[in-house]
């Protein structure tokens, strides 16, 4: 069994400004909500999903009432008093409240993406390699990389695909198709390890971006302690839905492909 922790406490202000009426995880993309697409990326029998939500959303937004039935094994964590400090803070709060298993292999998965991959094979290889962490990456041509302004979490890796450094809103290659881009899926050997290094990150305000702590940057502290962080380029098909522009671009490309296949 693994646990997949999905922080979904945000307000999604850019989507609200763009006229969307559902919070980001519940926006429909080709007939399914974003959160349903994410759940479909994992083996249902061997995965417990831990959804971190704001208590205000659980009370006032009917979309959240669907969460208990979205997967076979579900835990919903309610966060009361909330500050916008990013997914790392949400994870740490859930851990301190005893909602994150200390010993299980743990993935923190962002709530605005989809990829085609084999999650079971990925977990098995992480266990076989006995890595402390792993960041599945995508390389090559992906439409979300075309706009010059679109930069994400970029991984600098050695010849064996182990992490040397990760930076947010950055590309280690001028040609972005050559860089290793994080897919927003973050593996840790255990919940305890994820918490320890998340807590380390939050001790350093200079490691926040606009006041938020990103899970990606936790791994620089693992590297600093000589931990093994594997960055396989095993994501061949990736969908980025983080902003209204990302979603519009995705829909445009899907319509182009549908037209080409007629």
How should these model regions be labeled?
Residues 4, 177-262:
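Conserved alpha/beta core of the MobA/IspD/sugar-nucleotide pyrophosphorylase nucleotidyltransferase superfamily
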Residues 26, 155-157, 231:
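A structural signal for short hydrophobic beta-strand segments in well-ordered beta-sheet cores
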């Amino acid at each position: 069994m693994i646990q997949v922790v999905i922080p979904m406490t945000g307000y999604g202000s850019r989507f609200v400004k763009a006229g969307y009426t559902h919070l980001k995880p519940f926006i429909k993309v080709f007939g399914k909500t974003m959160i349903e697409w994410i759940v479909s990326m994992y083996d249902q029998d061997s995965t417990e999903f831990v959804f971190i939500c704001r208590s205000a959303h659980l009370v006032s937004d009917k979309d959240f009432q669907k969460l208990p039935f979205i997967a076979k094994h579900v835990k919903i964590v309610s966060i009361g008093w909330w500050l916008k400090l990013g997914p790392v803070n949400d994870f740490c709060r859930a851990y301190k409240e005893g909602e994150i298993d200390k010993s299980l292999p743990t993935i923190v998965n962002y709530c605005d993406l989809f990829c085609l991959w084999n999650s079971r094979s990925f977990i098995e290889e992480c266990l076989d390699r006995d890595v402390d962490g792993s960041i599945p990456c995508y390389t090559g041509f992906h439409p979300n990389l075309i706009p010059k302004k679109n930069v994400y979490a970029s991984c600098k890796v050695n010849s064996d695909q182990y992490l040397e450094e990760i930076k947010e809103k950055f590309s280690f290659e001028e040609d972005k198709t050559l860089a290793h881009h994080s897919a927003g899926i973050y593996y840790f050997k255990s919940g305890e390890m994820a918490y320890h290094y998340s807590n380390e990150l939050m001790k350093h305000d200079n490691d926040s971006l606009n006041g938020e702590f990103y899970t990606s940057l936790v791994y620089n502290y693992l590297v600093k302690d000589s931990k093994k962080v594997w960055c396989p380029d095993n994501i061949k098909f990736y969908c980025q839905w983080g902003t209204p522009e990302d979603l519009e671009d995705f829909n445009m490309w899907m319509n182009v492909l549908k037209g080409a296949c007629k």
